[in-house]
Design a protein with these regions (language model features):
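Short, cysteine/histidine-rich loop/knuckle motifs that typically chelate Zn2+
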Residues: 9-22, 37-50, 106, 129
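Surface-exposed beta-strand edges and their flanking turn/coil or helix-capping segments
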Residues: 18, 25, 47-49, 211-213, ...
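Ferredoxin-like iron-sulfur electron-transfer modules
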Residues: 1-12, 23-40, 54-63
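Acidic, serine/proline-rich low-complexity intrinsically disordered regions
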Residues: 68-287
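Short, surface-exposed linear patches
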Residues: 26, 48, 55-56, 218-222
């Protein structure tokens, strides 16, 4: 594993456990153990008073081509994996998305095989979902905004009965600490060191993922339903570094072109190497 603990120096105080952003360090009996979910971040070193933590023999493998292939094969995924990487301006090698387009629509294109990465900003967004993924809101005049709400969001046959329900439940989800200039969205194998990955899967595949994620740590993956796909998918993984799954909403499912049995899971990328390793260690590896 990337980091190891010197048993002669460790006093098992647990400071590293409480400060590990990946929840990758656990207590086993009287010992503190760094699990395979360690991502080389080194945060734990700064909190170890005894200087008991050092680099191990192995390093986390963040090769996106290798990880994309491994996830696809081990989970028997039928669709491609989307990667997201936030930045203040587009990378030189990535095309600026001109729009109008939906975040969920771009994801759907990549799920279905589009091999092009794009840099997505509010200017290219067709809806307010850009604010829900941490890049700020679109600009619109009052008449346009009211027309969109009344035509597609509010009232009988739409998403909410009344306008006051729009923001209800938003406080469940974390606030973004900053507004990014935009986000690169592309196939996982094309985006180096992304912040997040997101992909569709069925119930059994989700069970495989959650079992592998918690195999060494006992961590669970929370699921959400009832708000927009973008908000439910992105906020927790990006802000709190923990994976989530969700059923999506009407628009998100439509533009992602999800099948009836599919929902989506979003993972912080730094957790993916450990996830891939553990997929070979659970009960599902016996099948």
């Amino acid at each position: 594993m990337p980091f190891v603990i010197d048993r002669e120096l460790c006093v098992a105080c647990g400071s590293c456990i409480g400060n590990c952003p990946n929840s990758a360090i656990v207590r086993t009996g009287e010992q503190v153990v760094i699990t395979g979910m360690c991502s080389d971040c080194g945060t734990c070193i700064h909190y170890c008073t005894m200087g008991a933590i050092g680099k191990g023999k192995d390093k986390a493998d963040f090769n996106t081509k290798t990880l994309a292939r491994a996830l696809t094969e081990k989970l028997s995924l039928k669709k491609n994996i989307v990667a997201m990487k936030y930045a203040s301006k587009p990378p030189a090698e990535v095309t600026m998305e001109k729009g109008p387009h939906f975040w969920c629509g771009i994801c759907g294109d990549i799920f279905d095989g589009d091999s092009s990465a794009v840099f997505f900003t509010p200017k290219a967004s067709s809806c307010g979902g850009c604010a829900n993924i941490g890049i700020g809101g679109i600009k619109a005049n009052k008449e346009e905004f009211e027309a969109a709400l009344n035509g597609q969001v509010l009232g009988e046959g739409n998403l909410y009965a009344r306008k006051d329900l729009l923001a209800k439940g938003r406080s469940i989800f974390p606030q973004y600490p900053r507004v990014s200039g935009g986000v690169t969205i592309g196939p996982l194998e094309q985006v180096s060191m992304p912040d997040l990955i997101i992909f569709p899967l069925n119930g059994k595949q989700m069970c495989m993922v959650s079992t592998a994620y918690g195999f060494e740590t006992g961590e669970v993956i929370f699921g959400y339903a009832g708000k927009s796909t973008c908000l439910m998918s992105i906020s927790f993984p990006y802000v709190e570094n923990r994976p989530v799954f969700n059923a999506g909403d009407y628009g998100g499912r439509t533009f992602m072109r999800l099948n009836d049995e599919e929902f989506v899971v979003c993972f912080p990328f730094r957790l993916v190497p450990g996830l891939v390793k553990n997929l070979d260690r659970t009960v599902f590896s016996r099948e």
